[in-house]
A protein has these predicted regions:
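Short coil/turn segments at the loop-to-beta-strand junctions that recur within blades
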Residues: 64-70, 112-119, 161-166
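Mid-chain, structured segments of secreted extracytoplasmic proteins
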Residues: 63-102
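N-terminal, post-signal-peptide region of Sec/Tat-exported proteins
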Residues: 42-78
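N-terminal signal peptide c-region/cleavage motif recognized by signal peptidases
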Residues: 14-16
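Acidic, small-residue rich beta-repeat scaffolds with periodic aromatic anchors
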Residues: 5, 20-43, 120-177
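Extracellular C-terminal loop/segment signatures of secreted glycoproteins
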Residues: 97-117
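Sec-dependent signal peptide recognition
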Residues: 2-10
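Structural motif
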Residues: 45-50, 91-99, 138-148
Length: 177
């Protein structure tokens, strides 16, 4: 019994000394020549993600700052002068972010998403970006879910459900998966 007690105390005191440092998972160039770094620390439960943009490190999921998302990375890509990633933090949902700097204004733009399926298409325009995700959860009666970001307006509160893929006019369309 004494050995168990001593072992427990050693773990509590020495545990933080064994914490893994932040590692760079991906380094993606933006259109203005700067970079976005996806960073992670590893724990027993999985990975906790961070972003480094313009020299500042912050939690990857700034849309929910009081939540601590830990899980497995299921998507991480440099795409269209930006970064997209997703973390499976518990069945069945994945939470992710699409991040870029606008090619005209050089302002940082982001789309936060959380769905059962991963994004399949990225529509990139000079003033807008759009993620298209297959609707596998059917919380809305639609085949696809659209996450939008419009320059100067930001990301709408609600996700749009549609039955056909959006028009490609004015966009470069990239297949993500």
């Amino acid at each position: 019994m004494r050995k168990i007690w001593l072992y427990t105390i050693a773990l509590l005191v020495g545990g933080p000394a064994y914490a893994e440092p932040i590692k760079t998972i991906l380094n993606c160039p933006f259109s203005d020549g700067t970079h976005a770094l996806l960073l992670a620390t590893s724990t027993l439960e999985g990975q906790k993600l961070f972003l480094k943009v313009d020299g500042n490190i912050q939690s990857a999921f700034s849309d929910m700052p009081n939540s601590d998302f830990v899980g497995q990375i299921v998507m991480a890509k440099c795409v269209a002068s930006g970064l997209i990633f997703a973390l499976n933090y518990g069945t069945p949902y994945s939470k992710g972010v699409l991040l870029r700097k606008n090619p005209i204004s050089h302002a940082t733009e982001r789309i936060d998403f959380s769905e059962k399926a991963l994004p399949r298409w990225l529509y990139v325009g000079r003033k807008q970006m759009r993620l298209v995700i297959p609707n596998s959860g059917y919380e809305v009666a639609a085949k696809f879910l659209i996450y939008d970001f419009v320059n100067a307006k930001g990301q709408p509160e609600e996700v749009e459900g549609v039955d056909t893929l959006p028009d490609k006019l004015g966009f470069k369309v990239l297949r993500l998966k």
